[in-house]
Regions:
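P-loop NTPase motor domains
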Residues: 4-24, 29-227, 245, 284, ...
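Short hydrophobic alpha-helical runs that function as membrane-insertion/retention elements
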Residues: 16-20, 228-232, 258-262
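Active-site-proximal loop/turn and secondary-structure-junction residues that shape catalytic pockets
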Residues: 163, 200, 235-237, 265
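C-terminal regions of RecA-like/P-loop NTPase motor modules
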Residues: 187, 239-332
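Sensor-1/coupling segment of RecA-like P-loop NTPase cores
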Residues: 222-239
Length: 332
């Protein structure tokens, strides 16, 4: 969410900063079926029975639309499924993976949200969904109605969704994570890490089970793709708010290392129960100064002080006084 806070560090280490917002020119096409390089998998595991790439994409799209239209009925979900299949068929794409390729051997041009909108608006039964989708097609968020125009080839990438608000925030967060997850699965021999700030947006009460299951699945299986998943949240209550904390606890249980910073008394008590911390450790957590924390890993707990170098501080600080001092030095 606070991607702009990573901008300085990203630029200083030669990373790629990608802003996703209605005002940005950057776009990730949620309808895009991305080409997977399965060369490594075939070498390691041998050839396997192919799955339908279209079916896999439509499953993800159902999560996207469940966030965009939270009150979607069972009937509308079925009608949406049919509309999605029809939309891809309009581009010559079917459940047969061979249909993804054009005459030149590259993937065909993918549909965009506007193509789905045109299908939905034809029927009175799906017009409500079309009306809601219209904002992303012809309205203030129409930048989402384009082909993907960003690339994830850099070693360090920040996807900034901080300018998205309201219901678009959760939708945008899923959009970015869906794209990153596809990239992470490309090659199991390459190390990678996914950092998700304010993950409660996708696993908390403002989200739903489909999106939360998607996030939890990443934490469960990313090690099998040679990667790591790291998340952060400032509100443990939001983190544990959906389905009695099922997804938040699932992420914690699938995380080898946990870092706990300063917490209020109520939140500290919840953490104590989940992480089996002692009363002394909880007392420390509620009195931690800025920069102090508790690390839990391999059944060990260690109290630490995180110290950044001068350069690191300049790249990541959000402290107002430090920012003023940086401005003063640069203006001299």
């Amino acid at each position: 969410m606070k991607g702009h806070e990573f901008r300085r560090a990203c630029h200083n280490i030669g990373g790629e900063f990608i802003q996703i917002s209605p005002a940005s020119k950057n776009c990730i096409n949620i309808m895009e079926i991305r080409k997977n390089d399965k060369t490594v998998e075939d070498v390691i595991d041998g050839e396997r029975a192919e799955r339908s790439e279209l079916s896999a994409k439509i499953q993800r799209l159902h999560i996207f639309f469940s966030l965009l239209i939270p009150d979607m009925t069972h009937e509308e979900r079925q009608l949406l499924d049919e509309a999605l299949i029809q939309t891809y068929a309009g581009k010559g794409i079917t459940h047969q993976n061979e249909s993804l390729y054009g005459e030149t051997g590259s993937y065909k041009t993918m549909p965009v949200l506007g193509d789905l909108y045109d299908v939905l608006k034809k029927s009175t039964e799906t017009r409500r969904m079309a009306n809601i989708l219209n904002r992303l097609v012809h309205g203030s968020a129409s930048t989402f109605n384009q082909q993907t125009n960003v690339r994830l080839d850099n070693k360090y990438i920040v996807l900034d969704i901080s300018e998205l608000t309201g219901d678009l925030l959760t939708v945008g967060m899923f959009l970015a994570l869906d794209y990153v997850w596809d990239k992470a699965k490309e090659d199991r021999t390459q190390e990678k890490a996914i950092f998700i700030d304010e993950v409660w947006q996708l696993i908390g009460a403002s989200s739903n089970r489909l999106a939360a299951e998607f996030v939890l699945e990443i934490f469960k299986i990313i090690r099998g793709y040679g990667g790591a998943a790291i998340c952060a949240t400032q509100d443990i209550n939001d983190f544990l708010s959906l389905d009695d904390g099922k997804y938040g606890k699932g992420i914690i249980n699938n995380s080898k290392t946990k870092i706990v910073l300063n917490l209020e008394d109520e939140e500290a008590q919840r953490v104590q129960h989940i992480l089996n911390l002692s009363d002394t450790e909880i007392m420390n957590i509620t009195h931690f100064a800025r920069g102090n924390g508790l690390i839990l890993t391999n059944n060990n707990t260690v109290t630490v002080e995180f110290k950044a170098s001068g350069l690191e501080t300049e790249m990541i600080t959000t402290d107002r006084e430090q920012l003023r001092e940086m401005i003063r030095r640069k203006q001299e």
